[in-house]
Amino acid sequence: MKARKRLVLVILSGIMLVSVLFISGVIPAMDKTPYYDIDRNGKPFGHSVFTLYDDRVYAAVPSDGYFLIPGADPDSFRLLPDNNNHNGRQFAADKYHAWCGNLPVADFNPQTAVTIGNGYFTDGKNTVFCAPYTRINNELSALQKLYQEWRYGWGLSDKPLTYYYPQQPLPSSVTPYRILPDSGLISNGEQVFFDGKLMPGANPAALRPVAVRQDDKSVRESRVFYHDGEHVYYQHHLLPLKDTESLYGFYLGNLFQEAYLFDPQTGQAVMNNVVFPPEYAPYRVISYYGQHVNQGLFLSRRGVYFYDRKKEKIRRAGDNPPLQDSCQEISPLIFTCGIETRYLQGAESWGGRKSPGLISRSTMLYRLDDNTADNWVKVGDITSHHYGEVWQKGGQYYYFDRLGASQLMRGPIYLIPENTTVRALLSDDLRVDDLRKMAHDGRLQAVSGTEMLKATTRYKESMFSFLNFSDDD
């Protein structure tokens, strides 16, 4: 018994010693870089990410704070001419190095460095892309970061680099690189590059952005999809599509990380560089609106498909709902299908105290439980800002929301139990906060609906995950 107690004490003492040593390094690391003093007393280099503080140069790395640039020469440190804008604020040079954020640019002459534009720089011989955005350092694991934080706290290593400004050298070229008009891409007359990466086979003379349709029916040029009459690209990725004049791109509400491309001639759909299974085309998006959804849902010959952001692939949500092809979208995310009314709505599932964090995000297609034969009649818009709409079905009034979940409105359709609320909604001086209060105090009430279809992206497992019987793949 005494030996066992002695062993337990030794183990506990060891754990405490390791914990003390670990904390003794991590806590000093948190206060080692004087962020507040740099912000308050540092001297910024123009509108760049660089600041001179205490005769040393620091670079601001979004999501990671300030980084000391040990090799930077403060006396000769400079921004390049015509480089004091957003796309060039992360690039600088001194008499020894060129800098992309806090990292040096290899094989680059800082004395002859000039700006080309759109994040591209050249020394007359070598050309490099230095991104104006940061990217997470996937080579640094959580355990490695903690270990490096500990070493940094004790002064044994540099601050761990969790985020960084990506840089990409371009191939040597006899012909100087130039920015292509209207696209922001760069070319030497033979090859074309997106963010420093080759777009294989692209024709620089014909390459142009794909048209992107907006919610207000206007059209803008894509910043990620391009075509040249033969090839189609997402960023630098060559897509397995033939170029057609009818190609167009679109986004769904607040799902800004998901850029969609659609070919009406073939019915083929693409999300970023992920192609929907061609064998199930033609596809048709159920709704182009996304204020209340977490996934874009596409009808096909084999059912409804969506992009799973966690698994990074196209998945099957279920069978096509009956008569969905004949439904009419009378307002964003709200449909009439004969005497039925259907609507799309998103939901999130979060863990509790024992397992906190986001578990899943879903998008459901519901059938409104009120299926009376009365027609829908639009009563009016909610202010000139078009926050939403008031509709009537028989003797019942409803509020159709356009603000979305990001504005704390939980669903696209609400029941209006009192006529006084209808008059308040149609008031010209109604504010967004008034709508939130109405939804909170019951003047706008959640409707009752029957779930017809559900698409779920699961970010972590819960104790009820085994109850998920939705189709997959």
Give each language-model segment a name.
Residues F22-D473:
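Non-catalytic tandem-repeat scaffold regions and their flanking low-complexity/translocation tails
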Residues M1-V20:
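N-terminal Sec-pathway targeting helices
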